[in-house]
């Protein structure tokens, strides 16, 4: 066997040339102190604001305070396992979350990890949780309705796709119930094979709620067949403050996927008061200076940058939309507190719920006088505009008169008539939970109310009159509902037919 020296040297040279020194360079720091879910770390000089870092035991955190000699990190998890002197390494990625249709029907935590025991998430894309809102040029004014299925809201405080409508009220006034009914009302739009432009996907973000409450909510969605077009993001009361702070942003990013791909979504933040409290806790522990009510100075920016991401995009950007329904809990109906006034000024209107109305049996307990929708009326259908214009005026007069009527017993006939009509319209706007009405059904019911067909009835009979009329129109006279649904208008011809049907029904009902 002949071994040539030249060959050997050539092979050696080649191997030396191709010798790759695989070295992983990671930037690490050291934990200086840890406590209350906050870690102070020394040595992460190049860390980015909002970057994910990893502790020795695999717990993750987010760098929030970048100071001269150390970094303040909020911990996404328990801080019991983290000790002084442990190493922390950079991940070189800003906090992100999985997005896409693979999340529909799932319950995830604030970082997008599944918590429903149904296996891993089938999502290929990941997006940053905190991104800049769309500018002015890609936007379009709100022009399509986002139906909630509730007469009181769709007629008087209409919400459009791409709008931000605040739901505000004390505890136990039915805020979450309105949100739940809105999700259930989208079921007919999300049927299999429906065009994407019609569908409305739902994202529900639970912040600081009891686990039992969230489980109950998910159970209702499942039973009603609404979970398949919904995503639930849960950061419960037992989760650390950073999770409660980041959850709304995570949910928003999931909703933005639909908005940016020419689809439509609605996101419900339940509720932002608890997110503000979590943010206040983090800020104070990071030793940021407190402001009014001990909230940090940038708590307005916290909510504005979140809610500005809800938008209706124009045709050049796919015509998608993201509607936001933030919920705020007030203390003793105090709308002038810091967080409520902030969010009222950011949103395009508010639905104000009152405890007194709730206990009077007016449910949904919407105070029609204080509630407004600043942009929704341009999204209302023509049919609804025609009937709802009257009901607004009648109810406003009724509220004014009812206040005066308490003082005097001898009222003239016109005032008496106004009070009678008002009390029946108020009764008409009541609606039990889980029974949303389609737009055309709301139109015919309100038409009957504003045209005086309920005036002769006792108030207690209004509900049964409404139910009977609707079952008649859904059955024998379904052509009227079909005409309103297809034209989205109440033509003179349809109105005449409707009038005849209501009149004949009123005679038999009496």
Curated annotation (Swiss-Prot):
ATP binds at residues 169-176. InterPro entries: ATP_synth_asu-like_sf, ATP_synth_asu_C, ATP_synth_asu_C_sf, ATP_synth_F1_a_nt-bd_dom, ATP_synth_F1_asu, ATPase_a/bsu_AS, ATPase_F1/V1/A1_a/bsu_N, ATPase_F1/V1/A1_a/bsu_N_sf. The keyword Acyltransferase does not apply. It is a peripheral membrane protein. Signal peptide: none annotated. It holds the Pfam family ATP-synt_ab_N. Belongs to the ATPase alpha/beta chains family. Produces ATP from ADP in the presence of a proton gradient across the membrane. The alpha chain is a regulatory subunit. This is ATP synthase subunit alpha. It comes from Rhodopseudomonas palustris (strain BisB5).
């Amino acid at each position: 066997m002949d071994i040539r020296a030249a060959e050997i040297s050539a092979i050696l040279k080649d191997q030396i040339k191709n010798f790759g020194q695989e070295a992983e360079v990671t930037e690490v720091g050291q934990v200086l102190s840890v406590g209350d879910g906050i870690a102070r770390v020394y040595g992460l000089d190049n860390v980015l604001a909002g970057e994910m870092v990893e502790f020795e035991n695999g717990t993750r955190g987010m760098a929030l305070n970048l100071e001269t000699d150390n970094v303040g990190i909020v911990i996404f998890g328990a801080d019991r396992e983290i000790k002084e002197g442990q190493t922390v390494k950079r991940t070189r990625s800003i906090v992100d979350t999985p997005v896409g249709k693979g999340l529909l029907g799932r319950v995830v935590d604030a970082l997008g990890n599944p918590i429903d025991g149904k296996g891993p998430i089938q999502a290929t894309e990941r997006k940053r949780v905190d991104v800049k809102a769309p500018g002015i040029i890609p936007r379009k004014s709100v022009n399509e309705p986002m139906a909630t299925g509730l007469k009181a809201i769709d007629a008087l405080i209409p919400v459009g796709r791409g709008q931000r409508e605040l739901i505000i009220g004390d505890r136990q006034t039915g805020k979450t119930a309105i949100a739940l009914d809105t999700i259930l009302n989208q079921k007919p739009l999300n049927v299999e094979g429906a065009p994407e432009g019609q569908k409305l996907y739902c994202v529900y973000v639970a912040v600081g709620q009891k686990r039992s409450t969230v489980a109950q909510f998910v159970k209702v969605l499942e039973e009603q067949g609404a979970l398949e077009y919904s995503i639930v993001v849960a950061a419960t009361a037992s989760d650390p403050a950073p999770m409660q702070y980041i959850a709304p942003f995570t949910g928003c990013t999931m909703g933005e996927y639909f908005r940016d791909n020419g689809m439509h979504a609605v996101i419900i933040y339940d509720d932002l008061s608890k997110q503000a409290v979590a943010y206040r806790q983090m800020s104070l522990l990071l030793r940021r200076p407190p402001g009014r009510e001990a909230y940090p100075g940038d708590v307005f920016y916290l909510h504005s940058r979140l809610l500005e991401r809800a938008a209706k995009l124009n045709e050049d950007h796919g015509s998608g939309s993201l509607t936001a329904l933030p919920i705020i809990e007030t203390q003793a109906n105090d709308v002038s507190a810091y967080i409520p006034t902030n969010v009222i000024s950011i949103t395009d209107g508010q639905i104000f719920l009152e405890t007194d109305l709730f206990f009077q049996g007016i449910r949904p307990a919407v105070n029609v006088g204080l509630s407004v929708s600043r942009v929704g009326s341009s999204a209302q259908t023509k049919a609804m505009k025609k009937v709802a214009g009257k009901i607004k005026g009648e109810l406003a007069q009724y509220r004014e008169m009812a206040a005066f009527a308490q003082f005097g017993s001898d009222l003239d006939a016109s005032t008496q008539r106004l009070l009678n009509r008002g009390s029946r319209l108020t009764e008409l706007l009541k609606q039990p939970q889980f029974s949303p009405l389609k737009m055309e059904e709301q139109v015919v019911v309100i038409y009957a109310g504003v045209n005086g067909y309920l005036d002769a009835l006792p108030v207690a009979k209004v509900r049964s009159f409404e139910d009977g009329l609707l079952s008649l129109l859904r059955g024998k006279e379904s052509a009227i509902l079909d005409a309103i649904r297809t034209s989205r208008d109440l033509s003179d011809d349809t109105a005449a037919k409707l009038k005849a049907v209501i009149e004949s029904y009123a005679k038999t009902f009496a």
